[in-house]
Amino acid sequence: MKLSAWSKRLLAGVCTAALLAGGASALALSPAALPAPEAISVTNASDAQLRAALSKLAVVYSSDTHGWQVSSPYEDASLSSASCGLYPYLFLSQDDATVSLTLGMSCFSTQKMELQSIRVETKDSTYNFTCDDQYDGGYDADLKSWFDFEFFAMDDHAEYLTEWAAAKSVTATFTGKDGSTKAYTLTKDNLQAIRDIMAAYTTLLDSDAS
């Protein structure tokens, strides 16, 4: 989804200010890729909203992909404890000022499980995801667990994540190609991560020079 040039400058300004102040968690930016602080002194309400949204997230700049990846620290905690999870993240391109919303789904199990499909359920709705043929998993000796990852572009289905964030309970059922299944109820931290990412996503898309 396209961002205005103003929104792009605003994001860069927020990241630069956080870098100088040491305020954003897990912040790793390339200063050379960002404008000088004097050039991005935007101090309106949208600036404050974006600063607040990003302060809860990890913002990492990649010189390889020429952009920023925005993710939740809750995801790192989940992965390090071998917990299943449904965690969205954002990618903000430096080259064409676009923001992309992606959902990463991770499944950990005691036996190898190559995912075929994932069903997500709330009290009122069911959402079905079909996995690709590529196996992105393996065995983690440190965690003593098998895992598989699936990634889905969500720009056209952002409302799914908004609905999950508002639900009292969300359950994901992972189904393997061998017919095995594993159920996972999203934790409080997982739901909060979705809320935090969606708040940043909405703020970025709603930002304008007015």
What are these regions (language model features)?
Residues 1-5:
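N-terminal secretory signal peptides that target proteins for export/translocation
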Residues 8-25:
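Sec-dependent N-terminal signal peptides
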Residues 13, 25-210:
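A generic "folded-domain core" signal
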